[in-house]
UniProtKB/Swiss-Prot annotation:
InterPro entries: Ppnp, RmlC-like_jellyroll, RmlC_Cupin_sf. GO terms for molecular function: guanosine phosphorylase activity; purine-nucleoside phosphorylase activity; thymidine phosphorylase activity; uridine phosphorylase activity. GO terms for cellular component: cytosol. It catalyses: a purine D-ribonucleoside + phosphate = a purine nucleobase + alpha-D-ribose 1-phosphate; adenosine + phosphate = alpha-D-ribose 1-phosphate + adenine; cytidine + phosphate = cytosine + alpha-D-ribose 1-phosphate; guanosine + phosphate = alpha-D-ribose 1-phosphate + guanine. It comes from Erwinia tasmaniensis (strain DSM 17950 / CFBP 7177 / CIP 109463 / NCPPB 4357 / Et1/99). The keyword Glycosyltransferase applies. The keyword Transferase applies. Keywords: Glycosyltransferase, Transferase. This is Pyrimidine/purine nucleoside phosphorylase.
Length: 96
């Protein structure tokens, strides 16, 4: 079953799904802007198209991630994104 979600007044849209290869995951697109997300469990974020500037909780330096690159976000934390162009992503929900 697909689960469609919308955040930040429609600037971030995602479709959640579950599959044998990806497990529980979502794919989506973010418009230009700055966003703060909170996680309930650990996540692996892969940039599919575009790029993301990311600041993880506890870090002091922003890091750029381009298409094909991934980063992990701890569970029960926040992370901050700066999006300079429309960017597509895959988010896999990991076991803590």
């Amino acid at each position: 079953m697909l689960n469609v979600s919308e955040y930040f007044d429609g600037k971030v849209k995602s479709i959640g799904f579950e599959s044998a290869s990806a497990g529980r995951a979502s794919v989506g697109v973010m418009a230009e802007g700055e966003y703060t997300f909170a996680t309930a469990q650990a996540e692996e974020m892969t940039v599919v198209s575009g790029s993301l500037k990311v600041l993880l909780t506890g870090e002091t330096d922003w890091k750029w991630y381009q298409a094909g690159e991934a980063f992990n976000v701890p569970g029960h934390s926040e992370f901050y994104l700066q999006v300079a162009e429309p960017t597509a992503y895959l988010c896999r929900y990991l076991k803590d």
